Amino acid sequence: MERSDFVDRVIIYVKGGKGGDGSASFRHEKYVPKGGPDGGDGGNGGYVFLRANSNLSTLLTVAEKKKYIAENGENGKGKKMHGRNGKDIIIDVPLGTVVKDFETGEIIADLDKNGMVVCVARGGKGGRGNVHFKSSTMRTPKISERGAEGEERKLILELKLLADVGLVGYPNVGKSSFISKISNAKPKIANYPFTTLIPNLGVVQVDDLQFVVADIPGLIKGASKGVGLGNVFLRHVERCSVIVHIVDISGFEGRDPVNDYFDIRRELEYFSEDLAKKEEIIVANKIDLLSKEELEERIQKLKNATGKETFPTSVLTGKGIREVIYKMAEMVKESKKLNVEGEIVNERVKRPKPIWKELPEKFVIEIKRDGDDFVVAGPYVEEWAKRLNLTQRDGYNKFMELLEKNGLDNKLREAGAKDGDTVWIAGRAFEFKE
């Protein structure tokens, strides 16, 4: 994977499909002169789902599109034929993707199991056909409902890598070399800071235990505040159960391993208290550059300052690496005992009810002034104006009947309307008459 291919945060827009409109058709058959209404219901709009896929390691393909709009439901047809439901969209994302609402920051889902599925935008419910409006007083209803709009929202997708062990430490202390030595990872390695611009993942096998190690780049003093790209990558350490802190014990490039250790520790604490509490060991790398006496003195100083178990190693010669691998395996195994979670594979898609705005219990009419004109408004009025097809004679009549039955004329008088004044209802102008 090239460096530019790694995308771990993206903002996308999702929208469920609109419900299809109900039909206002009538039965037309030979020898059936009064066939009556036979308009079918509209289909429901399609949904948008996110699905965790362990074969993906980046949000790149999601970022390339950014807008995901499900298919609308089909309109109802004659002969009581129901419109087809709109097709769903299923967006595959990497395992470990956290889904947040862009407006509120609320976490909607944490897709931490392979095959896990979450609905992020519901489709609108299809409108009813005229067969639902037939009554003793309306035998040939030329009326149907429009389908509801689908749910829409902006989402933040953040990838938090699902690694068991996180490697932290200043740039150029040997993290990339270490992960390539202990695993199947093949990172690009060079001798300058910020060599690694993406987290490298490697799989380590110890006897019957397999675990994932992540090399977390960009950590320096001030990382939690954005220095050196550190805040971009710190969230990838959050899921790790074990932290391996690598320091350059040689100090040949002017580094002080004790100061370096505490610089990074403070950044972990600033970023997350939970992160700072994770199990940690120290790997003192580059011991091949020191004499025996210098090494013993520096290792003791580091242990005294940190109180942490410390492993002298040389990634170059391989000395001490085996001991670190087995210690990591022991810590991962212990952590897995404490956090036993079953895998969810091919999880059944849970489909909530389609969007259909529930009307308030009480029909409230609001009258607003717009200059000399009067505007009829209110949740009930606005919803019925959307729901009924006002271009249909009976739909329009039913809408006006609802308003009049709930005191429209009295409300207008109370608001000061006089004979001849202009009243706006659902985008149409009427003349008020006493």
Swiss-Prot record:
It comes from the Bacteria. Gene3D superfamilies: GTP-binding protein OBG, C-terminal domain, GTP1/OBG domain, P-loop containing nucleotide triphosphate hydrolases. Keywords: Cytoplasm, GTP-binding, Hydrolase, Magnesium, Metal-binding, Nucleotide-binding. The keyword Magnesium applies. Its EC number is 3.6.5.-. Belongs to the TRAFAC class OBG-HflX-like GTPase superfamily. OBG GTPase family. This is GTPase Obg. It comes from Thermosipho melanesiensis (strain DSM 12029 / CIP 104789 / BI429).
